[in-house]
């Protein structure tokens, strides 16, 4: 009897020892090997497939809580110029991924992402190669009409982002910066007809604002929501046009808010409604003139009831209201009005 009891105790000790050993091995694999494997494979993929460089700071994974953390990542050109970076990425996965046969993430949080978006003189974009592999996979999936993989994300948040944009196709490079950028996505699912709620907000260095929120479905692909652009400066528009117009947009702001409804299946349908488009304190000068005095000042323009339907290729505007407009004109030696030069320049352009 004693020998049997001792044998049972020995087996228990052996089982506990094996279990403890497996836990230690599991912990070592999760804490040490997986972060190393992720770092090596990520850098190899970026180097060999994308022809870029990837630097990663601290990479850690907790195999007991399924929490992945990556800090101080930087994607760069071969020349060393930065394409994108972020301060911190945290992904909290769930064990439910196993029995739900889906990628289930409780939370994804990206802090301080920084993207340098450059349009080269030939029209190419510096991030084109980043989506090359994904495009091949997407094309193959489209040919076979394979369903999307099941993905569920409880919350995805992007905090304090920044995008620096440079367009080198212009006569002089046009630059603009959006910061800070915030984005939130809640209860995301790729399930059929599931509505995913999102909210996006950004501000330019000039104080111009963009807010975009609504819902979208992954299957079929579609979206509806509302958007708002506030205090878009006339100077920003003029800086981008760079002399394509005979007039210069010297002052003023443009603001509007609207709603949209987009469907991509079975055909593209897009309806946009703009209840009011507001132009405030617009001032226009002649670009070629030696003085900088405005040739036209319009304190207030309101365009109301604008409806755009892509499906029927129709645009409707209910009302255009102009208040307090002042135009400065003089008669030239040939008897024509000075403002007629603007229409002549436009025709030549």
Where are the regions a protein language model picked out?
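Membrane-embedded beta-strands that build the outer-membrane beta-barrel scaffold
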Residues: 212, 225-227
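N-terminal type II signal-anchor transmembrane helix
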Residues: 1-51, 115-116, 122, 224, ...
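Outer-membrane beta-barrel translocator/receptor signature
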Residues: 207-210, 220-222
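Short beta-strand segments that buttress and anchor functional surface loops
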Residues: 71-75, 198-205, 214
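Short extracytoplasmic
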Residues: 48-73
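Secondary-structure transition motifs
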Residues: 2-6, 52, 72-185, 218, ...
């Amino acid at each position: 009897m004693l020998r049997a009891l001792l044998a049972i105790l020995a087996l228990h000790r052996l089982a506990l020892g094996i279990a403890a050993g497996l836990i230690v091995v599991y912990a070592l694999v999760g804490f040490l090997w997986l972060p190393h494997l992720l770092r090596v494979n990520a850098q190899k993929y970026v180097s060999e497939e994308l022809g870029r460089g990837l630097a990663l700071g601290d990479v850690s994974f907790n195999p007991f809580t399924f929490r992945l953390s990556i800090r101080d990542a930087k994607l760069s050109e071969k020349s060393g110029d930065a394409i994108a970076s972020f301060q911190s990425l945290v992904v909290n996965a769930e064990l439910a991924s196993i029995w739900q046969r889906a990628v289930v993430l409780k939370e994804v949080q990206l802090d301080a992402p920084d993207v340098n978006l450059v349009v080269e003189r030939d029209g190419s974009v510096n991030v084109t190669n980043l989506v090359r592999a994904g495009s091949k996979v997407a094309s193959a999936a489209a040919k076979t009409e394979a369903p999307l993989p099941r993905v569920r994300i409880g919350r995805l948040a992007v905090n304090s982002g920044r995008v620096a944009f440079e367009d080198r196709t212009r006569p002089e490079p046009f630059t603009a910066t959006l910061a800070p950028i915030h984005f939130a996505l809640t209860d995301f699912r790729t399930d059929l007809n599931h509505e995913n709620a999102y909210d996006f907000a950004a501000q330019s260095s000039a104080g111009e604002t963009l807010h975009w929120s609504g819902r979208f479905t992954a299957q079929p692909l579609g979206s509806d929501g509302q958007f708002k652009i506030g205090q878009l400066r006339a100077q920003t528009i003029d800086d981008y046009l760079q002399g394509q117009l005979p007039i210069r947009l010297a002052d003023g702001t443009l603001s509007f808010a609207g709603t949209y409804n987009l469907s991509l299946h079975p055909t593209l349908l897009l309806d946009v409604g703009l209840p009011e488009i507001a132009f405030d304190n617009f001032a226009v000068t002649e670009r070629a003139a030696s003085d900088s005095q405005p040739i036209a000042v319009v304190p207030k323009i309101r365009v109301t009831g604008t409806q755009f339907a892509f499906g029927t290729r129709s645009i409707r505007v209910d009302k255009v209201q102009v208040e307090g407009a002042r135009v400065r004109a003089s008669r030239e030696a040939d008897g024509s009005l000075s403002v007629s030069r603007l229409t002549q320049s436009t025709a030549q352009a």
